[in-house]
Amino acid sequence: MVPLLLLVTAGALRGQDNGKPTPVESVDLERYAGLWYEIARIPNRFQNDCVGAATATYELRDDGRIDVINRCTKENGETKEARGEARLDDKGGARLQVSFFSILGWRPVWGDYWILDLGEDYEYSVVGEGSRKYGWILSRSPTIEDERLEALFESLRSQGYDPAEFEVFGAAAGAAGSGS
């Protein structure tokens, strides 16, 4: 679970490190905090009962961690909510680890959350991880222009992702549902 100035951003030009996607160099987590709308995602097991787009809210904590609240609507109209936390995995803030559940109720299970592309004004974010099994395009607004979405898919392609794997929810018109 759970982010429009240039059509091709620096993230698209960095390439790959050891065959893995390359996160942006740094992220100001205070600016990153807040509400994000899911524009597109690679379908995954923990969102398989969500219909349409989800939202993610990130709130900074005093201990340096981040509270994560993901919400989506289920087919029956109910809101599904998942609460978790994130912690920094690097000094630049672009590599985080998130946990939404624990083993035996006390040992968290952490997953990678890498910010691969980020708008200069923090108006969009592209999130992924090393295996490319998971990926999201997030925006500060519920929709995104088709041209911006296509540029973000190009950024993902340059990072080794296949845009056709993405399910699109918040595109303006023409790109909706295309993922390519």
Show the residue positions of the predicted features:
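Bacterial N-terminal signal peptides
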Residues: 1-9
